[in-house]
C-alpha cells in the first residue's frame, strides 16, 4: 500500500473522530450512560474485528470509519463517569491517570503493534486489539455504575455551554497548545535522525523516551490541577514558549536537543487536567445538561490543534529548515499565555 494511501487512512480516521464525537455525544447525552457505553464498546469491537478481517482497502476504510465514529465518545464517556464517581478532592489525580492511560497506550501500543505486524501481520495486531476490547468490555460491564445522575436537555440547551467565556478560553488554550506541540512533533522523526544525526536504530528508543516524558507530564498535570491549576497555567505556558524558542539552537547538539524535546513533551501535557476540570466544573454549576459535551471538548479541539500545528509545520518546512519549527511554534505559545492570563482573571474575580 502506498504511503499516501496510509496517510489518507490516518487522515480519514482523525476527521471522522473529530466530526462524530460532538455529534454522537450531544445526540446520546440523554441516554442511560451504562447502556450507551456498552453499545459504543460493542460497535468499537465490531469495527476492530472488521479491520482485522479486511481483505480490501475499501473494507479497511469502512471498518476504520466505524471505529473512529465511536472512539471519541467512548473517551468522553469514560471521563464523564470518572468525574461523577470520584470524590472532588481526588478528581484531578484520577483524571490525570486516565490521561496517562492514553499516553501509556500510545507509548506501548504503537511499537508493540508495529512489532506484531512485522513478525506476523497487521491483521493480527487488530485481532489482539479485538481480544483486549472483550476483556475491557467485561471489566466495564462489571464496574460501571448502572445509573448515574443526569440532567436532560435539548441539543440547543447543551450547546449553550459554548457561550461561556471560561469554556471558550479553555478551548482556545487547547487549540494553541496542541498547535505548538504538533508544529515540532509532526517532524519529530527527521528532527531526531536528520537534524540531530541519531541513527535509525536509536530512533524507536528515543521516541519511547519522549512517550515516557508524556506520561510524566500527565502525572505533573494532576499535581498542578490539585493546587489551583488555573493560577499556574501562565507559568506553564511561559516555560513551554521558552523551550520552543530555544529548540532551534538546542538541536545543534544531540544532548541539548533531546533534553529540550523531552522537556517540551512533559510541559505540553500539563495543561490538560486543569482545563478538563474547568470544563466539567462550569458544566456542573451552570450547564448540567451539557456535562457530556463538556468532557468531550478537549478531544474535539485537540484534533483542531493537531491539524493546525501539522499544517503550520508543513508550511514552515517549505520555506525554511527544520530548526525553524520551534520559533514558529512559539507564536502559539504566546497565544496560550495570553489566553491563560485572561482565564486566570475570571477565577480571581
Task: Identify the residue ranges that each predicted region occupies.
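Conserved MFS/SLC helix-loop-helix module at the cytosolic interface between two early adjacent transmembrane helices
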Residues: 19-55
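Paired small-residue
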Residues: 47-50, 58-67, 255-263
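Extracytoplasmic gate region of multi-pass secondary transporters
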Residues: 168-208
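Helix-to-loop junctions at the C-terminal end of transmembrane segments
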Residues: 21-32, 218-229, 317
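Helix-loop-helix hairpin linking two adjacent transmembrane segments in secondary transporters
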Residues: 59, 87-144, 187-194
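Cytoplasmic helix-loop-helix junction between adjacent transmembrane helices
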Residues: 57, 63-102
